[in-house]
Amino acid sequence: MQSIQIPTGIHCANNLPFVLFGGINVLESEDLALRSCAEYVRVTDKLGIPYVFKASFDKANRSSIHSYRGPGLDEGMRIFEKVKQEFGVPIITDVHEPWQAAIVAQTADILQLPAFLARQTDLVIALAKTGKVINIKKPQFLSPSQMAHIAEKFREAGNDQLILCDRGSCFGYDNLVVDMLGFDVMTKSTGGLPVIFDVTHALQQRDPGGAASGGRRQQSAQLARSAMALGLAGLFLEAHPDPAKALCDGPSALPLAQLEPYLAQIKAIDDLVKSFDPLHID
């Protein structure tokens, strides 16, 4: 198993205690970012869970041109700096264009390659050249084994500090399912890279013809428990103080007030699964 080191001494690997990549979908305001991060830090400190704060500064792939995208690059980096100063946590955020990579890398500790852009070679090279840890979102339209080709692009560009993230696979039109066998396929096909699970976006459910995604947050705990029972390197999760008022993906977001009991269950499962001796079946 390959272990990836994240600033502040966090190690991310499939056989180590899981890392939480948690936060809000998009930066709505400085106040919301700070309040949300404060609760994440309180809960993860209490439960002993390594933690990375996540949010987007620009949701560049919204279905409607009228949908909220975020504060933009400059204001987004300012808010991230404030979060880091206040809480001392690592930051993960997504990059959509090659020219953004070097700028975002000055603030963020982990750069995320969005699922819809995962095969864009120029973006891959720009991200690789930053030398930062990279979180690669698996496109909904790719098989798990195809992630090996994306990982190889990064390695050829000089960066092997990679994490793989599954966020579900297309199942017909406007629906996603999670292939539980695919996590192991991704790890083995990439030489043991850490694999994490984005439970929030796996819960998305499109309204045919609608301009915004629906979601199934009522099934979030069941899906997260199932995936984390496989022994994964981390969980990618979004929570919001009031999901009904969230400016993006509220229907898939966990109510922030339920974060502690939710993560307590995930940690119990992770601790149990990783206490087992490896079982190799021929």
Swiss-Prot record:
What SUPFAM superfamilies does the record tag this protein with? Aldolase (SSF51569)
This protein's major location comes to cytoplasm
| Pathway annotation | Carbohydrate biosynthesis; 3-deoxy-D-manno-octulosonate biosynthesis; 3-deoxy-D-manno-octulosonate from D-ribulose 5-phosphate: step 2/3; Bacterial outer membrane biogenesis; lipopolysaccharide biosynthesis
Q: What compartments host this protein?
A: Cytoplasm
Give the UniProt keywords, A-Z.
Cytoplasm, Lipopolysaccharide biosynthesis, Transferase
**A GO BP annotation:** keto-3-deoxy-D-manno-octulosonic acid biosynthetic process
Q: Which reaction does it catalyse?
A: D-arabinose 5-phosphate + phosphoenolpyruvate + H2O = 3-deoxy-alpha-D-manno-2-octulosonate-8-phosphate + phosphate
Class in the EC hierarchy, top level: transferase
Q: Which domain of life is it from?
A: Bacteria
A single MF term (Gene Ontology): 3-deoxy-8-phosphooctulonate synthase activity
Transmembrane stretches in the record are none
Q: What is its EC number?
A: 2.5.1.55
Where does it sit, as one GO cellular component term? cytoplasm
Asked whether the keyword rRNA-binding is assigned, the reply is no
InterPro entries, per database record: Aldolase_TIM (IPR013785), DAHP1/KDSA (IPR006218), KDO8P_synthase (IPR006269)
Keyword check for Transferase: yes
Q: HAMAP family in the record, alphabetically? A: KDO8P_synth (MF_00056)
The molecule here is called 2-dehydro-3-deoxyphosphooctonate aldolase
What is the name of the gene encoding this protein? kdsA
